[in-house]
Amino acid sequence: MDQFIKQDETGDLIETGMNVANHFLSAPIQGTNSLSKASIIPGVAPVLIGNPEQKNIQHPTASHQGSKSKGRGSGVRSIIVPPSEAGNGGTQIPEPLFAQTGQGGIVTTVYQDPTIQPTGSYRSVELTKIGKERMINRFVEKPRISTPVTEFKRGGPGAAAQGQTIQEEGIDGNGASAGSKERSGSLSGATLYAHLSLPQQDSTPANVGIAPQSAISANEIMDLLRGMDARLQHLEQKVDKVLAQGSMVTQIKNELSTVKTTLATIEGMMATVKIMDPGNPTGVPVDELRRSFSDHVTIVSGPGDVSFSSSEEPTLYLDELARPVSKPRPAKQTKPQPVKDLAGRKVMITKMITDCVANPQMKQAFEQRLAKASTEDALNDIKRDIIRSAI
């Protein structure tokens, strides 16, 4: 015989079980007065052997179940229908009660009203719930009863403890045995008395009180936060102003680069002029120099042609060094320098003093010097000192 179940057979078994469960759950509850043999579902007749009209219905279980429950006693458990749910014969039962089974495989159902009898659908649901409860209670271990602990004293057990007998604790069902208690065989009292340790709790209880009020320093913290917020806003305003001047800074950089380019061009032109005219100017006009180069004294000794001599200036003169010249040069007169307008420069220097000088004493000293200045050189010196003090 093949010990392995095929996949098709497993699927058929699962489908059959689901059909049986759906049949039990979907079967309507009939309100008949009695349970006839025609209403019994095929397959559960051995369980329902006996007269269904009796008040107490007892059904023996299978032989293998009875052999396992012989040592546990023959207990009988009952299901009691409350009077509120009891009625006349033929009434519909809204919710069937759980049927309980006792030891020995005996199922007993007790009704307070003899007129109410279970119908076929009720018994079907009852049998289904009996099997479910058996499967659940199969793995539940019954509570154990511990034997009292005898008090141990020096010199052996007391007179009251001598008459007590210790019985081994049995277990009713599957599970490990807790063992048996035995008295100490030592009568010398070498082993001291030890108290029984109490069971430990899962958690230690804690006292719950009213939550404390707000701390006193909360107001100080709020004031500090407000101050920090104000400082942050002030810094943000300054940063916004700095960012707003970004375009102006870019424009200043462009103008500065233009000025540097122009200055480099001027320096190149000045170097070219110095190369072309390395001498020092004397202040004599160019026409005068050309005329002095062209006019010269010619001495004719003896007869000869004197037609080449100029007849415009026949008279010669002697200069300061007794040199013969055709005409004495007029004395050089110094031209008076034009008086420049210094009012505009004074206004500019006054503005520089106001913007660049922060020290009140230095500002007053510059204003006094500006009032006394009457030449351009004095104004330039004042302007130079203002720039140095600002740096």
Swiss-Prot record:
Q: Name the coiled-coil region(s).
A: 218-245
Where are the stretches annotated Interaction with the nucleoprotein? 343-391
Chain intervals for the UniProt region annotation (Multimerization): 216-279
List where Polar residues composition bias occurs.
54-65
Keywords assigned: Coiled coil, Phosphoprotein, Viral RNA replication
- Role noted for this protein: Essential cofactor of the RNA polymerase L that plays a central role in the transcription and replication by forming the polymerase complex with RNA polymerase L and recruiting L to the genomic N-RNA template for RNA synthesis. Also plays a central role in the encapsidation of nascent RNA chains by forming the encapsidation complex with the nucleocapsid protein N (N-P complex). Acts as a chaperone for newly synthesized free N protein, so-called N0, allowing encapsidation of nascent RNA chains during replication.
**Family indicated by similarity:** Belongs to the rubulavirus/avulavirus P protein family.
Q: Which CDD domains did the record assign? A: MEV_P-protein-C_like
Q: What is this protein called?
A: Phosphoprotein
Q: Which InterPro entries match?
A: P/V_Pprotein_paramyxoviral
| Phosphothreonine sites (modified residues) | 10, 16, 91, 150, 165, 250, 258, 282, 298, 375
Matching Pfam families, A to Z? Paramyx_P_V_C
Q: Which organism is it from?
A: Mumps virus (strain Enders)
Annotated region Disordered: the residues are: 54-98, 148-184
Assembly, in brief, is: Homotetramer. Interacts (via multimerization domain) with polymerase L; this interaction forms the polymerase L-P complex. Interacts (via N-terminus) with N0 (via Ncore); this interaction allows P to chaperon N0 to avoid N polymerization before encapsidation. Interacts (via C-terminus) with N-RNA template; this interaction positions the polymerase on the template for both transcription and replication. Interacts with host RPS6KB1 kinase; this interaction may play a role in the viral replication and transcription.
> Which residues get modified to Phosphoserine?
69, 188, 257, 292, 294, 301, 374
Q: What is known of its domains?
A: The N-terminus consists of a long intrinsically disordered tail. The central part contains the coiled-coil multimerization domain (MD or OD). Forms a four-stranded coiled coil structure. The C-terminus constitutes the alpha-helical X domain (XD) that binds to the nucleocapsid (N-RNA complex) and the L polymerase.
